[in-house]
A protein has these predicted regions:
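A mature extracytoplasmic/lumenal domain signature
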Residues: 1, 52-54, 159-161
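Soluble metallo-hydrolase cores and metallopeptidase-like ectodomains found primarily
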Residues: 1-18, 41, 191, 198-199
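Generic structural signal for helix capping and beta-alpha/helix-loop junctions
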Residues: 4, 60, 164-165
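Acidic/histidine-rich catalytic neighborhood of metal-dependent amide-processing enzymes
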Residues: 17-113, 142
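Active-site-adjacent substrate-binding region
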Residues: 87, 96-205
């Protein structure tokens, strides 16, 4: 929803420059807006809530709970008191040319059956080079605060691996449309749509 206000992961001369946030911010929004446009294709008994969290990327690494301010607030003050859902999927940096999505550590702890189901769907759709069934370290992201506040099982589709870190354009002026890859957005969007058409089986037991 929002972007890091400065390119503090780039060269010194650019570290006070704003970034477009085409991937780290806008890519997830783009996929969800397209999903919303096509939501009429879903069965009538499938309920979908789409939430855009603000102020996710305004924090300071050394300051606890300074990131993900929108999701922290929503988890304590949901739009419907007592709100719950069968599961949730967070999208973060889902438009990169080299994007690879691993089993993020917190997601595996809180919703392993969802991870397995979503990644299986992606691989069956031909996206096994993007959705890789290999675990990586936990990250603090919006899904962490949603789970903490609501206990809704959450998974994070995020371009991150503990050995390589975030994409090279992350928090730099190069996070722009030139580095957005339409096939990556398509892979994530189609995987999401098919997940809604065939939810994880354990939801019905």
């Amino acid at each position: 929803w929002d972007s890091r206000p400065v390119a503090d992961n780039g060269p010194i001369e650019n570290q006070n420059s704003p970034i477009d946030g085409a991937n780290d911010g806008a890519s997830g929004v783009a996929v969800l807006l397209e999903l919303a446009r096509n939501i009429d294709s879903l069965p009538e008994d499938v309920g979908v809530d789409i939430i855009f969290f603000d102020a996710e990327d305004l924090g300071v690494s050394e300051v606890e709970n300074s990131f993900c301010l929108g999701s922290q607030y929503w988890a304590k003050n949901p739009h419907v008191p007592g709100y719950t859902a069968h599961f949730g999927i967070l999208l973060d940096m889902v438009g990169g040319k080299k994007a690879k999505f691993y089993w993020e550590g917190n997601s595996k702890n809180w919703g392993s059956y969802i991870l397995s189901h979503v990644w299986t769907i992606a691989q069956e759709l031909g996206f096994s080079s993007r959705f890789i069934t290999e675990s990586t370290a936990p990250v603090i992201d919006d899904h962490a605060y949603v789970y903490e506040g609501t206990k809704i099982p959450m998974v994070d589709i995020i371009d991150y691996h503990h050995s390589s870190g975030f994409p090279e354009e992350w928090h730099t002026v190069n996070d722009n449309l030139e580095n957005i890859h339409k096939p990556t957005l398509h892979a994530v969007g189609i995987t999401l749509e098919n997940t809604l058409l065939t939810p994880p089986p354990s939801l019905f037991y």
